[in-house]
Design a protein with these regions (language model features):
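Conserved pre-motif I regulatory segment
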Residues: 1-38
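Walker A/P-loop
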Residues: 30-49, 59-62, 171-172
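Conserved helix/coil segment N-terminal to the catalytic DExD/H
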Residues: 41, 48, 89-132, 140-146
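Conserved catalytic network of the ASCE P-loop NTPase/AAA+ motor domain
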Residues: 51-53, 75-77, 99-104, 123-128, ...
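Conserved nucleic-acid-binding Ia/Ib motif block in the N-terminal RecA-like helicase ATPase lobe
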Residues: 58-60, 65-118, 182
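Post-DEXD/H (motif II) to motif III coupling segment of the RecA-like Helicase ATP-binding lobe
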Residues: 126-127, 131-184
Length: 184
């Protein structure tokens, strides 16, 4: 399926916004990308569409439970099998979602960076065909990764544990030169 056809089918749009097509092409080609686009500029679509076009499951690292829920709700409304795994879930909900992930039921799974250190999640991820890893709000790697959310600095270790390195797509609305270097 061509990307414009997939865009129309999954999201109802007939054209890309500025910069989206180029980022999507890079991800589909298996390259790492850093997308810096304004708030409301369509960053999420730049990793969601490739996730739908590629085989496997995309892991999306997101800093806030509310962002995860909003993204997953929108995807599910569009008929996309997706979920989030975070601390808001009960033990039963968590077990059910991990089992669904293990069975490959989801095209996208949203997690906080801390989840990448959870033994059971890492074991499941190592068994999956991971299409890509997306880091939403990637400026948090620099701004939160040093003290407040040190798990952001652990993302490369998680990627190294995977049997096959997937493309990594990082997205943010704001990034200074220093932040860009830290993300890379």
């Amino acid at each position: 399926m061509e990307k414009l056809e997939a865009l129309k089918k999954h999201f109802g749009y007939t054209a890309f916004r500025s910069g989206q097509a180029q980022l999507i092409d890079q991800i589909l080609a298996g390259r790492d990308v850093l997308g810096i686009m304004p708030t409301g500029g369509g960053k999420s679509l730049c990793y969601q569409l490739p996730a739908l076009m590629k085989r496997g499951t995309a892991i999306v690292i997101s800093p806030l439970i509310s962002l995860m829920k909003d993204q997953v709700d929108g995807l599910v409304e569009n008929g996309v099998a997706s979920t989030y795994i975070n601390s808001s879930l009960s033990g039963t909900e968590l077990a059910a979602r991990l089992e669904g992930l293990r069975r490959g039921e989801f095209k996208l799974v949203y997690v906080a960076p801390e989840r990448l250190n959870a033994r059971e999640f890492v074991e499941i991820a190592r068994m999956l065909d991971i299409s890509l890893i997306a880091v939403d709000e990637a400026h948090c790697i620099s701004q939160w990764g040093h003290d407040f959310r040190p798990s952001y600095k652990e993302i490369p270790k998680f990627i190294q544990r995977l049997p096959v390195r997937p493309p990594v797509a990082a997205f943010t609305a704001t990034a200074t030169t220093f932040v860009k270097e830290e993300i890379k």
